[in-house]
Amino acid sequence: MSTRLLAVGCNGTNVRLCKMRQRVTQTFFNFLWDHAPTVSKKIIKRLFFAPTTYKSTPVEREYLDNAKKFEVSIHDKTVKCWKWGSGPSILLAHGWNGRGIQLHHFIEPLRQSGYSAIAYDAPGHGESQGRTSSYFEFTDTIRTLLTSPYGHEIRGVIAHSLGGSATVNTIEKENLPLKAVLIAPALRLKEVLYGFFDYVGVPRTIYELLIKEYEDQFGYNMHRDNPVNLLREIHSKILIIHDTNDPTIPYVDSKGISDRFPNIELHTTERLGHKKVLADSSVVNRAINYFGEQPRKKEGKEMSKSINILEEYRKGDLDRRLNLFLECPSLRAEFLEIDQSEAVGPS
């Protein structure tokens, strides 16, 4: 991947400058590939497959400090993971150049709805090991998490950008019935990636050979595993959230795809772009509501009600205690266990 998944195309007054830059880049990489292919590959990997550093905010660091931490191993790279809350989990999958904590706006609303949240830093990102990464490693990270000790708890995924691509690949490969919310997903990933290489001027023969090396290393195929080609095999429900002004991943891709598949729903936003969409409260609420509220939350309300009744029981006089005892038969045993010396009931 590049530092940007999609670049602005050559147009207007910049077209001649753009084409000139492409020719210079093509000449440079062709010469380097002919005379020092190993060096050429290293340069391309460093330029296009090495993510930039994501700087966490104080709020994000506080979330990380208060999470339960665990690790998984992806192709001999340690991947750092965090969990908040209890109950069934929703996995938060970040995109290229991001971090799991980038989706922190979803954590507390998920907990309020009875879910726990699990986030991770993909290989080469954040606190995880590695200097480079790829779509295939993103996919294997999610697949590994779903088969980890925490995997049986995962009920759905909220994924951003390349994380959405990897989520689609995972659901198809594992034949999972997971619900997924894909935010600004790169579903035509091959076209986006190839388009970027063409835009900057990397010769096609060179980047296709490099991608082939990644395919052989990780056991995937860029054409076969292009997310748009996998969607026809997926029957679980998917919600796509995409902004019309996204400068990175074209909104029209999500619109066209959602029109083709009955199990895919599209929620459109405006003026949020590619990243601000992750912090928008209406987007967060739409995503949480898509999974539905867990019964555990209702049980929690009942528990709070029970606690209030118990408190009233402790403070009440003899008549009030007797009435509470008779009105709440399901709580009698609990009342008696609280304070045997004060328990009041029919003799």
Question: How does the language model describe each region?
Answer:
Residues 14-71:
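An N-terminal hydrophobic leader/cap segment in hydrolases
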Residues 100, 107-129:
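Conserved alpha/beta-hydrolase
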Residues 106, 236, 250-257:
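Short alpha-helix in the alpha/beta-hydrolase fold that links the catalytic acid
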Residues 132-150, 155:
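Alpha/beta-hydrolase active-site loop
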Residues 158-167:
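Gly/Ala-rich beta-loop-alpha elbow adjacent to hydrolase catalytic centers
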Residues 172-220:
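Hydrolase active-site cap/lid region
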Residues 233-235, 240-242, 246:
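Short beta-strand/loop motif that positions the catalytic acidic residue
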Residues 272-284, 302, 307-313:
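Catalytic histidine-centered segment of alpha/beta-hydrolase-like enzymes
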